[in-house]
Regions:
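A long amphipathic alpha-helix within ATP-dependent nucleotide-binding catalytic cores
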Residues: 203-206, 211-224, 237, 242-334
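Intrinsically disordered, low-structural-confidence terminal and linker regions
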Residues: 1-34
Length: 346
């Protein structure tokens, strides 16, 4: 009964939040008050010398007029500090347009959204469709540890399922951008977690406890602290999957996730031969990198080993789900095979 109430509350909350966010000015106010990246860039803009304040004001006015929403993303993308033509500036799509207008165009008539944004539902969908993914061995609901069948069990019982040195990831089921993820958690040695209470989880969130994946050596050399995944953008036309682009997402030193919101960088992968672009980029804060800033790994001339085989396995994975029009898959290359970690709509 409680679970049904929580699911109903969660659905209602998301529905209300989605409706409220459609108001451009509420959306803008929320970002200005809560988005740390926006706030940092706003401070930089006030002392910017790349352009005059008058030029910045005029560009923001044109940006807002063109996209019909406040020019918050002009600030967040750091466009005040980039010497670009107005045409190029207008190519930067505002978040409000993407999540409201474009998202509705892509998914407005999709009625089966099961697994759309919930990591536990996605895991069950992957199991149903025969898609390899890191194993979920437990759930945590309202700070209660449960087996995947819903039966409560103890911390000691969980420890008995985990080998010495094995890493676990504890993720909110509806999280994003790497927020609130507890990564590289060990129950026996190293970065050891001695008790359930020491995790300091948020009681209102539901978490999956997932086995960590050991990535292949060539990916590990780029950055060993994170699982570096292939963000694979897929367009579905007449239920046939077409890969639009692939980016290798790479974490930074000491950070256990590769999300851009946690400082990660991305480098484009050539679809034909698996070679990397000469430079990696960073969504949050901008910048270009010819090598990984922590490990010194040089991108130019490097490639993903056995690319034809890897690409064929990716194509097999993405063909097994065709409910949506566009998906951003997160694909990991393990020591023994290729795995789907999760997917993101749009």
């Amino acid at each position: 009964m409680i679970d049904e109430f929580m699911l109903d509350w969660k659905y209602r909350y998301k529905t209300i939040r989605r409706i409220v966010k459609r108001n451009k000015f509420i959306f803008s106010l929320h970002r200005r008050l809560t988005d740390k990246e926006y706030q940092r860039e706003k401070c930089k803009m006030s002392t910017c010398t790349t352009k005059t304040q008058k030029q910045i004001h005029e560009e923001m006015k044109k940006y807002a007029c063109y996209w019909q929403c406040p020019a918050d993303d002009y600030v967040r993308y750091g466009l005040f500090d980039k010497q670009l033509s107005m045409e190029k500036i207008l190519d930067y799509v505002p978040m409000h347009y993407f999540y409201c207008d474009y998202y509705d165009q892509q998914f407005g008539d999709v009625t089966d959204m099961n697994g759309g944004d919930d990591k536990w539902e996605q895991y069950q969908l992957f199991q149903e469709r025969g898609i390899k993914t890191p194993e979920v061995i437990a759930l945590i609901k309202r700070n209660v540890l449960q087996r995947t069948n819903g039966i409560s069990f103890s911390w000691e019982e969980l420890k008995s399922l985990v080998a010495d040195g094995e890493r676990l990831f504890i993720k909110p089921t509806d999280g994003n951008s790497g927020i609130d993820i507890i990564g590289n958690c060990m129950l026996h040695q190293g970065k050891e977690v001695n008790s359930f209470n020491s995790l300091a989880l948020k009681s209102y969130l539901t978490y999956v406890v997932q086995r960590g994946l050991v990535q292949r050596d060539d990916l590990n050399r780029i950055n060993p602290s994170s699982l570096n995944t292939l963000r694979t953008i897929v367009l579905y036309e007449n239920k046939k999957a077409r890969i639009v682009a692939i980016l290798l997402r790479i974490g930074r030193k000491g950070v256990e996730v590769d999300n851009s919101g946690q400082g990660g960088i991305s480098v484009e992968v050539n679809l034909a031969d698996g070679t990397f672009s000469s430079f990696a980029g960073r969504e949050h804060g901008g910048g270009q990198f010819d090598r990984h800033p922590d490990t010194g790994y040089m991108f130019k001339g490097a490639r993903i080993k056995d690319w034809d085989d890897i690409k064929a396995k990716i194509e097999n994975i993405i063909s097994r789900i065709d409910t949506y029009r566009m998906i951003g898959w997160d694909i990991a290359i393990g020591q023994d095979d290729v795995y789907a970690v999760e997917f993101n709509l749009g």
